[in-house]
UniProtKB/Swiss-Prot annotation:
The modification Methionine sulfoxide is found at residue 16. One of its GO terms (biological process) is killing of cells of another organism. Keywords: Antibiotic, Antimicrobial, Cytolysis, Disulfide bond, Hemolysis, Knottin, Oxidation, Plant defense. The presence of a 'disulfide through disulfide knot' structurally defines this protein as a knottin. It holds the Pfam family Cyclotide. The keyword Disulfide bond applies. Belongs to the cyclotide family. Bracelet subfamily. This is Chassatide C11. Expressed in fruit, pedicel and stem but not in leaf and root (at protein level). Disulfide bonds join 3-19, 7-21, 12-26. It comes from Chassalia chartacea (Chassalia curviflora). PROSITE patterns: CYCLOTIDE (PS51052), CYCLOTIDE_BRACELET (PS60008).
Length: 28
């Protein structure tokens, strides 16, 4: 599920909610 956040230059801020970077977009 996309978290509505990109992770091209910075890590996923939403990572604290279980999201991770995949193909430059944060997914949960």
């Amino acid at each position: 599920i996309p978290c509505g956040e990109s992770c091209v230059w910075i890590p996923c801020i939403s990572g604290m909610f279980g999201c991770s970077c995949k193909d430059k977009v944060c997914y949960s």
